A protein has these predicted regions:
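Polybasic, glycine- and aromatic-enriched phosphate-binding surface used to engage nucleic acids
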Residues: 1-158, 205
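Non-catalytic DNA-recognition/assembly elements of restriction-modification systems
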Residues: 37, 151-207
Length: 207
């Protein structure tokens, strides 16, 4: 989860062998014979693979995954344990393999990304979230579902999307994205200057 940063992530140039079991009626399972180099690598672990209870149609295949297609969609990913909010946008179908990493798919992801990474969100989680006891917060799914998301019109949703797209293609930095999106969010919820100062002093911008 350490590769996950605020808004984005650092790819460690590592590849995941996804010998999936397919999706019934939609996607055929991986046939390991089509990938001799991968098979040769996995054969070194045959004893362990063949004995595991969660295998697919063959020991080479992973067990069935109902949300396999979600990994190929644009998504927000985050680690469960972090000192600050670090929600990243992944638009290219990459896998983020980590035991305590979560993903979110659906509509209006750029807007949700900006809300989740805002000082407003961090202040909220400081009140309702659980901690590890060493200064980090556990960004659990059930806690995130309690976050109140302001309703915005189509024009504003498109504006957030444009800002995030500029970040994804490298036209603006994460610092600029944070500055632009937070300013809009403060206006959406109607914060006055004193309230903005309180929130940002409570959790100063993190890049």
């Amino acid at each position: 989860g350490r590769d996950i940063k605020r808004y984005g992530y650092n790819w460690a140039n590592l590849w995941l062998i996804n010998t999936h079991n397919g999706i019934r009626g939609k996607l055929e399972r991986i046939h390991i014979e089509d990938y001799p180099a991968v098979k040769a690598h996995l054969d070194h672990y045959w004893d362990r693979m063949s004995k595991r209870a969660d295998k697919g149609d063959t020991p080479y295949n992973l067990r069935n995954c109902a949300y396999l297609e979600d990994f190929n969609k644009p998504k927000i990913v985050w680690g469960e344990i972090s000192d600050r909010s670090k929600f990243a946008f992944e638009a290219y179908g990459s896998f983020i393999p980590e035991a305590t990493t979560f993903l979110m798919v659906g509509s209006d992801l750029p807007y949700l990304l900006c809300v989740l990474n805002s000082p407003l969100s961090e202040w909220f989680f400081s009140k309702v979230g659980t901690t590890t006891g060493v200064g980090t917060v556990r960004w659990k799914k059930y806690t995130i579902q309690e976050l109140l998301i302001p309703s915005v019109n189509v024009k504003l949703r498109q504006l957030f999307q444009q800002i995030v797209e500029k970040y994804v293609i490298g036209n603006i930095t994460s610092e600029q994205l944070s500055k632009y999106s937070n300013k809009i969010l403060y206006e959406v919820v109607g914060l006055i200057d004193e309230e903005i100062e309180f929130v940002e002093n409570f959790y100063p911008p993190l890049i």
